Every structure is written in C-alpha cells, then in structure tokens.
Curated annotation (Swiss-Prot):
MF GO annotations: RNA 7-methylguanosine cap binding; translation initiation factor activity
Protein name stated in the entry: Eukaryotic translation initiation factor isoform 4E
Keywords (A to Z) from UniProt: Cytoplasm, Disulfide bond, Host-virus interaction, Initiation factor, Nucleus, Plant defense, Protein biosynthesis, RNA-binding, Translation regulation
Gene assigned in the entry: eIFiso4E
Family label: Belongs to the eukaryotic initiation factor 4E family.
Gene3D superfamilies tied to this protein: RNA Cap, Translation Initiation Factor Eif4e
GO cellular component, one term: eukaryotic translation initiation factor 4F complex
Effect of residue 190 to K: In allele eIF4E2b
Function: Component of the protein complex eIF4F, which is involved in the recognition of the mRNA cap, ATP-dependent unwinding of 5'-terminal secondary structure and recruitment of mRNA to the ribosome. Recognizes and binds the 7-methylguanosine-containing mRNA cap during an early step in the initiation of protein synthesis and facilitates ribosome binding by inducing the unwinding of the mRNAs secondary structures. Key component of recessive resistance to potyviruses.
Length: 200
C-alpha cells in the first residue's frame, strides 16, 4: 500500500508579509485616555470635576477608531456634557501637575457639524503626533452647550508665548478656523471669563 510522502517544511507556503503586517495592530507613539464629564444635572454642593469619569485608555490606531466610531463623537453628547482626550497619566483638571502652569487654545462654534469635524481633525492630529511641540500638549476638550459649542486644546506652559503661538497657528490650520484665542488656567481660576492672552 502506497503511503503519502511527508510534506517537507519548504513546501508549506509561508504567510505573505503583507498579511502578517495587516494583522498586527498599529501602535501609537504614546497612550491616550478618553474622559467623559456630564454637568447637566450637578449634585448640590458637588465639587467641580466630581462628575469627571475616565472612560478608556488606548494605544493603537485600531482601538482609537473603534472607540471614536462607537462612542466618542460630540453629536452623541447632551447639553452641558464634555468629551476629553488627554495623554495617559494626565487628568483634564487645572490641578494636574502637567496642566497647573498651562492654558488652553479655544474655538467656539454654533453649528454641531463644525464641532464634530474640528474634534475629529484634532484627535487625528494628536494621536498622529502632527504638532512639532507635541510634548507641550496635554489634550483636547469638546464641550457641548445649548447656545454655543466649544473646543479647547490644553497645553503645559502658558507663559512660553513662542511655543503657544506655534501650537496655535498649527491648530488653527488643522481645524480651518477663522480665529482662536488662548487663556491661562491661572486667570480662569480667578475669573469665570478669563481674558485672552494670545490670539491667532
């Protein structure tokens, strides 16, 4: 009775390099965390930030798109709610050591579609490390309000005007905004509507 010859290892077709690469997740330069904050029904006497919740931390392109598509679109938010994307390890609070001496670039919009587009463009720029001063950036906040929505890019060193202006010009280009302004967190702590220190 004839027996089948054993298959030599060299006869087994190797998996193509492209298939192997396609199956591997695409790691980002750093880990990022999505946060959620809903201030629509604040509890009496609750401290600011008490409704802030850490949602998901991710480190691959695939995880980012899955989370964005399923959850983290501003159009899914109710009024007085916020989405945050910050570097892992940094909390979206003035008190965080990385944010304490910082400030934020802000753009406002009265159209929900604009906020959605600017939010996505900013997220892609952050996780894709498109800013030359990426180490100076803490994260971004999308705030949905009844009258006007707001997008804020938080940075570490408010007093360094040269760095902030460079970041501001780049961000303005990314989101295709007419005007954005920068305020210091220290000013915001003292006054509800802090004046703008820089504008582009």
């Amino acid at each position: 009775m004839a027996t089948e010859a054993p298959i030599e290892a060299t006869e087994v077709p190797p998996a193509s390099a492209t298939e192997t690469v396609a199956k591997q997740p695409h790691k980002l330069e750093r880990r990022w965390t999505f946060w959620f904050d809903n201030q629509s029904k604040p509890k009496q006497g609750a401290a600011w930030g008490s409704s802030l919740r850490k949602a998901y931390t991710f480190e691959t392109v695939e995880e980012f798109w899955s989370l964005y598509d399923q959850i983290f679109k501003p159009s899914k938010l109710t009024a007085n709610a916020d989405f945050h994307l910050f570097k892992a390890g940094i909390e979206p609070k003035w008190e965080d050591p990385e944010c304490a001496s910082g400030g934020k670039w802000t753009v406002t919009s009265s159209r929900k579609a604009n906020l959605e587009t600017m939010w996505l463009e900013t997220l892609m720029a952050l996780v894709g490390e498109q800013f030359d001063e990426s180490e100076e950036i803490c994260g971004v906040v999308a705030s949905v309000r009844r009258s006007q929505d707001k997008l804020s890019l938080w940075t570490k060193t408010a007093s360094n005007e040269a760095i902030q202006m460079s970041i501001g010009r780049k961000w303005k280009e990314i989101i295709d905004a007419e005007k954005i302004s920068y305020s210091f967190h220290d000013d915001s702590k003292r006054e509800r509507s802090a004046k703008s220190r820089y504008t582009v």
